């Protein structure tokens, strides 16, 4: 901070993360060492193919951080319309230049360096006058500086030599210094008035529009993260040069967010916002649109005339400004969502909603249960449209993905078992705060992490989601003050990144469980085949054993017929029509196939085999013959069918 120029407009400081990076590598390597399933996944999945590079990068990054001071700063300025950024950090031990040269050589792409490493003498010889595609690291005994323009780096180096900097005494610098009080691990700040003045279009109409929104008076944006473990906390502030006005004032003052009493304690994501009077917001938005000659509201009169209602008076005027949206399930076929809105006049709003359904020729069913009247209909798309239900309960409008979703919300509210009453939610409140706020964002971090893991290993996503029931809440609270909008959140020791680490560590156990389930299913299926073969032989003694799985299964007519060609002893999931002696059939992560030794339609022996689809679905192949013994072999999935003699050489399953 003391060495930066007064013209600095953006400031980002990050604490030294060398040790955390080292710990991540250590933990992951331990898991790789102990878990064969994880090693196979790491070596075969799409993401895992990049794994060794990621691991090596983290290791190098932790080594790099050993050379640096307590924090690294990214400072931004602007000359004309071109932003300029420099990365600056103190150095604390010798050898950094050699380390960087070696690392950049390793990262070089086909001989093209990704960055140039120089000392002061080397930098002086660079004659470039424009930003370069290849950034420069200037390594000095006291500082390391990185940028894409040699002239800017030289200018900053001169400032370091003179130990001169004006930012500390400037108002923006003083605001940044204030954020450091009490300690911080990550700090980001922007002088918005400087940025606005530098990026002004010169178009009076555009500049006036920005001013009219209220955001043209934005002063500073500051965000900081402090503490570690159970003491983690973040704070943000968007301040203004005076009282908030225009769109910047639409966020209301803190209030008790009572709509949270309708939110399920098992929700994955919930967002609540407290607006000022929605009807007044409509008026201000319309006025702004008209002043800029925007046609945003041009279609509203036609819409109102056709549907015979007033958007302002009949809808927005009946809402109290408090809105909550929640998502309870991420499964595409079981998507469950709800929206809860504060209502001023329930009778007026119900009349309006009924009129809109009638005007749009939407058929709605009406159900009454437990004192709650629920209306259900289909969204756009007719019978295939999304199911939507709504009910007005105790002064709140509940809209959800079907009757069940709405009924659950009403029950949660009346039973007092809502998210707002749960221990993990209450523990997420910032110190000294209640749930009086202008807005709130909530997430279940492990459930959110399952979405990321699910992209890599879809069969694990459901397990991770189920494991999120006892996870720590992650919430962000927003407060609308007269001349600022503030944000506070408590991580309680586990944020999304932490959840992903936990999930990654849990993968071996989840994989073991999945593999065990697949293998147990495969063994059970082979036992079913053996039993079916015995039954087939006694039913059709002239034929002996069935020649393939399809013969043991149902025929084209389904489960009605029982013939020697289709004995209907096994269901189609294992013995479909395509499951011939030359084809593999798939069930529960395993491929199945059966052949037989036959002469003139009489089969005297058979071999049935089950082998994993991939190395991620099992580690053992299984087989069985007419002796009824299940045998196994550890190794890669089979490509070819095995003979009866080869099967009998495998290890018998105990």
What are the residue ranges of the model-derived segments?
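A short acidic/small-residue loop/turn micro-motif
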Residues: 637-640
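Amphipathic alpha-helical segments typified by the pilin-like N-terminal helix
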Residues: 491-537
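Structural boundary/hinge residues at secondary-structure and domain interfaces
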Residues: 1-130, 169-221, 235-333, 347-363, ...
């Amino acid at each position: 901070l003391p060495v930066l120029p007064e013209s600095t407009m953006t400031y980002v400081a990050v604490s030294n993360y060398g040790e955390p990076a080292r710990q991540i590598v250590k933990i992951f390597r331990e898991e790789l060492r102990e878990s064969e399933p994880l090693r196979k996944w790491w070596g075969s999945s799409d993401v895992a193919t990049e794994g060794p590079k990621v691991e090596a990068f983290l290791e190098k990054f932790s080594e790099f951080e050993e050379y640096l001071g307590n924090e690294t700063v990214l400072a931004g300025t602007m000359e004309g319309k071109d932003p300029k950024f420099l990365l600056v950090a103190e150095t604390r031990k010798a050898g950094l230049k050699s380390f960087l040269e070696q690392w950049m050589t390793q990262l070089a792409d086909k001989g093209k360096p990704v960055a140039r490493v120089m000392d002061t003498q080397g930098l002086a010889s660079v004659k470039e006058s424009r930003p370069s595609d290849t950034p420069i690291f200037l390594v000095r005994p006291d500082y390391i500086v990185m940028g894409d323009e040699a002239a800017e780096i030289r200018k900053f180096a001169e400032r370091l030599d003179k130990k001169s900097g004006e930012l500390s005494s400037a108002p923006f610098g003083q605001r940044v210094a204030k954020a450091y009080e009490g300690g911080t691990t990550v700090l980001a700040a922007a002088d918005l008035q400087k940025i606005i003045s530098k990026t002004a279009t010169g178009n009076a109409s555009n500049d006036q529009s920005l001013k009219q929104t209220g955001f043209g008076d934005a002063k500073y944006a500051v965000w900081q993260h402090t503490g570690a473990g159970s003491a983690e906390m973040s704070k943000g502030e968007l301040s203004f040069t005076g009282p908030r006005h225009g769109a910047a004032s639409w966020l209301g003052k803190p209030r008790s967010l009572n709509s949270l009493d309708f939110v399920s304690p098992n929700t994955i994501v919930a967002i609540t916002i407290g607006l000022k009077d929605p009807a007044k917001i409509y008026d201000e938005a319309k006025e702004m649109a008209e002043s800029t000659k925007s046609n945003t509201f041009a279609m509203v009169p036609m819409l109102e005339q056709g549907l015979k209602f007033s958007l302002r008076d009949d809808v927005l005027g009946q809402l109290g400004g408090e809105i909550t949206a929640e998502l309870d399930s991420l499964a595409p076929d079981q998507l469950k969502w709800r929206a809860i809105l504060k209502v001023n006049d329930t009778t007026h709003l119900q009349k309006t909603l009924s009129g809109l359904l009638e005007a749009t020729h939407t058929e709605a069913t009406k159900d009454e249960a437990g004192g709650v009247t629920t209306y259900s209909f289909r969204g756009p798309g007719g019978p295939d449209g999304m199911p939507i239900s709504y009910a007005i309960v105790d002064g709140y409008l509940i809209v959800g993905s079907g009757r069940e979703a709405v009924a659950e919300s009403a029950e949660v509210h009346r039973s007092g078992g809502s998210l707002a009453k749960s221990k993990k939610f209450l523990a997420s409140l910032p110190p000294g705060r209640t749930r009086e706020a202008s807005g709130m964002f909530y997430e279940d971090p492990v459930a959110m992490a399952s979405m990321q893991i699910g992209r890599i290993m879809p069969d694990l996503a459901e397990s991770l989601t189920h494991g999120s029931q006892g996870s720590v809440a992650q919430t962000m609270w927003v407060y609308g003050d007269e001349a600022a909008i503030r944000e506070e959140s408590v991580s309680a020791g586990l944020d999304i990144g932490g959840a992903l680490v936990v999930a990654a560590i849990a993968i071996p156990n989840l994989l073991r469980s999945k593999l065990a389930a697949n293998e147990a299913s495969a063994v059970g299926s082979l036992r079913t085949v053996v039993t079916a073969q015995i039954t087939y032989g006694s039913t059709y003694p002239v034929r002996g054993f069935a020649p393939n799985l399809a013969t043991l299964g149902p025929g084209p007519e389904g489960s009605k017929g029982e013939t020697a060609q289709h004995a209907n002893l096994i269901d189609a999931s294992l013995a479909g029509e395509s499951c011939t002696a030359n084809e593999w059939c798939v069930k529960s992560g395993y491929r199945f196939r059966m052949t037989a030794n036959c002469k003139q339609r009489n089969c005297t022996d058979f071999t049935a085999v089950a082998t994993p689809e991939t190395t991620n679905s099992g580690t053992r192949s299984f087989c069985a013959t007419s002796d009824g013994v299940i045998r196994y072999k550890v190794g890669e999935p089979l490509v070819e069918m095995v003979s009866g003699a080869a099967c009998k050489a495998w290890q018998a399953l105990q």
